[in-house]
Amino acid sequence: MSSGRIVQIIGAVIDVEFPRDSVPSIYNALEVQSAAGTTLEVQQQLGDGVVRTIAMGSTEGLKRGLEVTDSGAAISVPVGKATLGRIMDVLGNPIDEAGPIATEERWGIHRPAPSFAEQAGGNDLLETGIKVIDLVCPFAKGGKVGLFGGAGVGKTVNMMELIRNIAIEHSGYSVFAGVGERTREGNDFYHEMKDSNVLDKVALVYGQMNEPPGNRLRVALTGLTMAEKFRDEGNDVLLFVDNIYRYTLAGTEVSALLGRMPSAVGYQPTLAEEMGTLQERITSTKNGSITSIQAVYVPADDLTDPSPATTFAHLDATVVLSRDIASLGIYPAVDPLDSTSRQLDPNVIGQEHYDTARGVQYVLQRYKELKDIIAILGMDELSETDKQLVNRARKIQRFLSQPFFVAEVFTGASGKYVSLKDTIAGFKGILNGDYDHLPEQAFYMVGGIEEAIEKAKKL
């Protein structure tokens, strides 16, 4: 356990000088001997015994000359069943005022990704109960899903609904990593889990937006380490990350503070490598699976921005939320033409599901093309076939909406879970013209097709 002294403090970056024969390794955790007991993580070795570190907490009250000790290892966090039902910070310390975490076992947050031989893939579908997702971009068990959307189109609400539906229907363990998001949402989420009686199956790790960049950069790794432990014990784990963009943003802040030259749009030059290091660890092995659902903020609604563009490469399914669809009052505001999944293959999901999904996409795409003609010349100028197609498209568009359980408080409508079988049957019926006689308003904000038929009787 060598010790050194602080020689420079610039924001969250602290330089510490050690004797030359005992310089700490990269990623070692250092402890500042002060009242706050701040933890530092070594990022660079500058030579002459000086290391540049990033603080995992506030640097208020620190000054030059304070003693710092090297722990000799990376940051480690508690893992295992004792973490379930608890809220922890980036260092694995409990922040829910419910006493210490009762486990001796701790794992370092920097771990190698599973080797090629250890990895395992699967094609089992994971039903979410959300019509548009199950139909157009089905999730795979052990797959990686991204929820892409700009500000305020419903990423977190969709994420909460997915957690509610999957965590309640799915009997395994879940880990939720709140990376640089609102503390209020973290609090809402905790109470949502508590009220649904699934809190004892969820471990919560928060590094919210008011915390220093070091915390936001590492909190995703803390959550992932806990998920890896459950996976290696042979469980099927769900890992929720909200929001992966804030992880990139924290990396940008740290990179600038460390004096690296920025790359495209001001992002860190190591963007792809940092994302790869995180994403390659989120994978399924022969022991167990990690199914991960990640919210991805899209700056200025531009999907070609380097951050969302780098994330795309790692995902099996992408759910794109659209502001145009949200402005029509259709929630969830998922764009069925922009969202994709690797599972959308007749050999995986079956011919009926595949044909229905592609049929829905064809009708919506054709409607999109006809919109300009309708805007200029009106509906009367369309051929009978096109008129019929437009009417069906409008019904499909409305039938893709659905009341959420987590939004009951705001909408007053009770949430609906729609099975995959009912989803396919409903859309297939609309495509075949079985419901051409029903008004389009009957399809808005309902669960299955039976409910739409009932609603039509009241209109």
From Swiss-Prot:
Give the matching Pfam families: ATP-synt_ab, ATP-synt_ab_N, ATP-synt_VA_C
Q: Check the record and name the InterPro entries matching this protein.
A: AAA+_ATPase, ATP-synt_VA_C, ATP_synth_F1_bsu, ATPase_a/bsu_AS, ATPase_alpha/beta_chains, ATPase_F1/V1/A1_a/bsu_N, ATPase_F1/V1/A1_a/bsu_N_sf, ATPase_F1/V1/A1_a/bsu_nucl-bd
Subunit annotation:
F-type ATPases have 2 components, CF(1) - the catalytic core - and CF(0) - the membrane proton channel. CF(1) has five subunits: alpha(3), beta(3), gamma(1), delta(1), epsilon(1). CF(0) has three main subunits: a(1), b(2) and c(9-12). The alpha and beta chains form an alternating ring which encloses part of the gamma chain. CF(1) is attached to CF(0) by a central stalk formed by the gamma and epsilon chains, while a peripheral stalk is formed by the delta and b chains.
Q: What is this protein called?
A: ATP synthase subunit beta
Principal EC category: translocase
Bilayer topology annotation: Peripheral membrane protein
Which Gene3D superfamilies does the record cross-reference, listed alphabetically?
Answer: 2.40.10.170, Bovine Mitochondrial F1-atpase, Atp Synthase Beta Chain, Chain D, domain 3, P-loop containing nucleotide triphosphate hydrolases
- Keywords carried by this UniProt record: ATP synthesis, ATP-binding, Cell inner membrane, Cell membrane, CF(1), Hydrogen ion transport, Ion transport, Membrane, Nucleotide-binding, Translocase, Transport
Question: At the top level of its lineage, which domain of life is listed?
Answer: Bacteria
Q: Which GO terms describe its cellular component?
A: plasma membrane; proton-transporting ATP synthase complex
EC number(s) per entry: 7.1.2.2
What does the record give as the organism's lineage? Answer: Bacteria, Pseudomonadati, Pseudomonadota, Gammaproteobacteria, Pseudomonadales
> Secretion signal: which residues?
none
UniProt-listed CDD domains: ATP-synt_F1_beta_C, ATP-synt_F1_beta_N, F1-ATPase_beta_CD
Residue sites binding ATP per the record: G149, G150, A151, G152, V153, G154, K155, T156
Q: Which GO terms describe its molecular function?
A: ATP binding; ATP hydrolysis activity; proton-transporting ATP synthase activity, rotational mechanism
Record's family?
Answer: Belongs to the ATPase alpha/beta chains family.
Q: What does this protein do?
A: Produces ATP from ADP in the presence of a proton gradient across the membrane. The catalytic sites are hosted primarily by the beta subunits.
Query: What reaction(s) does this enzyme catalyze?
Result: ATP + H2O + 4 H(+)(in) = ADP + phosphate + 5 H(+)(out)
